[in-house]
C-alpha cells in the first residue's frame, strides 16, 4: 500500500514541474510586432501579433496563449506590403517605377516641350496612397515676344491664346533704311522664353564714285541708306567690269564697285574662232571690237600630226594677245587648208 505522504509529495513535484514550463520570447516575423513583448511568458498569458504600418496580414493567426507545454504553436501569419493603385499613364510624359508596393517611390518626367506641374516623385504611403499627388505634364508657354526697336513682326501666329508653345517661331523685319543684325527668326525654348532678339540699326552708305570712262545713277536724295541701289554704265568703246547694279549693304559699303574697261580691236582680218562654244567668223562677230573679258579660241595646226588644236585669247582692258601658233589664212593660198577645217588632234 502506497503511503499517503508519498502520494502528496509526488503531486507536489508534478505541480511544480508543470507550473515551471514558461514560454520563451516568440519568434520574430517579418514586418510585424508582438504585444506584449517579453523574454518569457507564464502559461495562460496571451500575445497578439500585428503588422507594422504599411503592411497587411495575409492569412495565419494573430493571437496565441502560452500553453502548459511552454511551446508556442507554429505561426503562419504573413505581413505583406500594401500596394498603391496603378499610377496610370502620364500624358506627354513617362513614369519610372519598379513596383507599386509600400514604401517604394515612383518618378516622373515630361516630354520635350512640357514641364512637370507637381512633384517629380511620389511615395507609396502606409495607407496605400501616393504622396504627394501625381503631377501632370503641362505645355511650355512663351509670352508674346518683345519687338526690337525699329522692327516689326512679319510672321507671328500664337498657338495658345495670345501665347506661344515650345518651338513656335516669330519673324521680324526692320523698318526701311535699317539693317538687321542677328537672326530674323526667334524660337520659343524649353525654358519658356525666346531665343535672342535681333537688332535693327540705321545704315548709311557714301555716294558711289563715277567710274573712269563711265557714269553712275543713284536716287536723288541727301543720304543713301541700306538697300538703296546704284546703276553703272560705260561710254562707247568701253565695257563694264562688274555688275551693272550695286546695293548698299548692312556694313555701310557697296556690294561691288564696277569699272569701265576698254574694248579690244581684233588684230586679225579673217579667222574662224570658237566663242561661247560656237564657231564664229571673228571679222563678223567682233567687227566693232571685243568687249573687255570676252574670250575666243583660235585654231592652230600641228604639222607633225597633221591635226588642229585651239588656244585661248582674252580681251583685257583694250589688249588681246593672239596665240603665236595661229597663222592667218590667206585667200591667195587657196590650195592650203585653214586650221579650223583640219581634223582635231
Swiss-Prot record:
One of its GO terms (molecular function) is lipid binding. Residues 21-81, 82-139, 140-202, 203-262 form the Sushi domain. GO terms for biological process: blood coagulation, intrinsic pathway; chylomicron remodeling; negative regulation of angiogenesis; negative regulation of blood coagulation; negative regulation of endothelial cell migration; negative regulation of endothelial cell proliferation; negative regulation of fibrinolysis; negative regulation of myeloid cell apoptotic process. Gene3D superfamilies: Complement Module, domain 1. Binds to various kinds of negatively charged substances such as heparin, phospholipids, and dextran sulfate. May prevent activation of the intrinsic blood coagulation cascade by binding to phospholipids on the surface of damaged cells. It is found in: Secreted. Disulfide bonds join 23-66, 51-79, 84-124, 110-137, 142-188, 174-200, 205-248, 234-260, 264-315, 300-325, 307-345. Keywords: Disulfide bond, Glycoprotein, Heparin-binding, Repeat, Secreted, Signal, Sushi. The lineage of its organism: Eukaryota, Metazoa, Chordata, Craniata, Vertebrata. The keyword Acyltransferase does not apply. It comes from the Eukaryota. CDD domains: CCP. This is Beta-2-glycoprotein 1. Residues 1-19 form the signal peptide. Glycans are attached at residues 33, 149, 162, 183, 193, 253. Expressed by the liver and secreted in plasma. PROSITE patterns: SUSHI (PS50923). Residues 263-345 are annotated as: Sushi-like.
